[in-house]
Design a protein with these regions (language model features):
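Short, solvent-exposed loop/turn segments enriched in Ser/Thr/Gly
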Residues: 40-45, 102-103, 116-119
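Low-complexity, serine/threonine/proline/glycine-rich extracellular segments that form mucin-like
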Residues: 35-73
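Extracytoplasmic/periplasmic copper-protein system
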Residues: 2-4, 33, 37-39, 126-153
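Extracellular adhesion/glycan-binding regions together with long Ser/Thr-
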Residues: 84-99
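Low-complexity, intrinsically disordered segments enriched in Ser/Thr together with acidic residues
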Residues: 96-115
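Bacterial N-terminal signal peptides that target proteins for export
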Residues: 2-12
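A surface/secretory-pathway sequence property marking extracellular, secreted
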Residues: 64-88, 136-139, 148-152
Length: 153
């Protein structure tokens, strides 16, 4: 009977660790910080890249701000120069090694209407690219390359 009591906690701990290892890739997605902004106000959001494209360094990030966002500006960061053309902010000219975390900041005036808004991002690397443009449908599993979501309140 004593053996059973020790096996159950050990099995639970093993299952927890396995679950964390399986979930770990979800942390590698590009995310917005803060993820929530007030409608109709000026805000600055960092879109954080945590890795390259299959170990290749990031050389460019193209952030496609949705319609309704105005006064869009990119903030130069760590060797990257930000340029804005319409709704698109492009960070280029630098190299971000794989496994290095960096926030690429965009300032804007948020639209008035509340809701969840996906922000599509194209990550270009020395070898290849990753399109963070997939939108998660209600009740569906998270896609492989989800677009970060901003919540407008």
């Amino acid at each position: 009977m004593t053996r059973f009591r020790f096996r159950l906690p050990a099995a639970a701990a093993t299952a927890t660790v396995a679950g964390l290892l399986i979930a770990a890739p979800a942390f590698a997605h590009i995310h917005a910080d803060p993820a929530e902004v007030q409608g109709g106000t000026e805000a600055t959001v960092g879109f954080t890249v945590e890795h390259g494209c299959k170990t290749s360094p990031t050389t460019e990030l193209e952030i496609q701000m949705p319609d309704g966002f105005t006064a869009i500006k990119g903030i130069d960061v760590a060797g990257f120069t930000a340029t804005v053309k319409g709704q698109v902010v492009t960070f280029a000219g630098g190299t971000l090694p794989d496994g290095t975390e960096q926030a690429f900041q965009v300032s804007f005036t948020a639209p008035d209407e509340p809701g969840e808004v996906p922000v599509k991002i194209i990550q270009t690397c020395e070898e290849g690219s990753t399109n963070w443009i997939e939108v998660q449908a209600d009740g569906q599993a998270e896609p492989e390359h989800p677009a970060p979501v901003l919540t407008i309140t």
